[in-house]
Amino acid sequence: DTEHRVSLAGLSQPRVEPEVVFGFARAPRAGMTLPQLADCLEWVAHGFEIVHTHFEGWRFAAPDCLADFALHGRLFVGPRVPVARFADLALDTANLTVTLHRDGQPVETGHASIVLDGPLNALRLWVDGMAEHTPGWPIRAADLVTTGTITDAWPMSAGQRWHTTLGDPRLHGLTLATVG
């Protein structure tokens, strides 16, 4: 589904982040190359993560944020596209552009390469970090992972309509209509 109504109730200072989302077909392991990691994936999709924090003005240090279990509020994942439709998943997702619109007006165009040199590379770094720092928490088939925002995180309020247009026809834009 590409259109969603989302309640902002219970969220503090919510912001919207357009991201790339990957779904695993099988468990990856640390130290994989990008092509090896791509072979562990079943699908790729565009998603919206809504993040929030009670730290006033979004001013905090990363350790404070992590200790507070802050940021993630909601996740909306668009249509899942089989990775087999991408000749070079690392390059194709790194070259992705996303234009974020609020109430019909473009607010920012982002390039996925800003996400640690591309979403698949960001995923590789995350897989390696998970193996090193949380070896008892394995990544399994059917898990999904978001890879980081492609634009700034934009403040949201009730009554807005957020929409994305993507520079790759294989991936679908999403629309969020916000309510209180």
Model-derived segments and their meaning:
Residues 1-123, 127, 131-133, 157, ...:
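Catalytic-core "active-site belt" of small-molecule-metabolizing enzymes
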Residues 102-103, 147, 167:
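Short strand-turn-strand beta-turns centered on an Asx-Gly dipeptide
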Residues 109-110, 141, 147:
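Thr-Gly-centered strand-to-loop micro-motif
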Residues 150-154, 168-171:
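Short, charged beta-turn/beta-strand-edge "cap" motif at the junction between a beta-strand
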Residues 162-165:
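Short, aromatic- and glycine-rich surface loops/edge beta-strands on solvent-exposed regions
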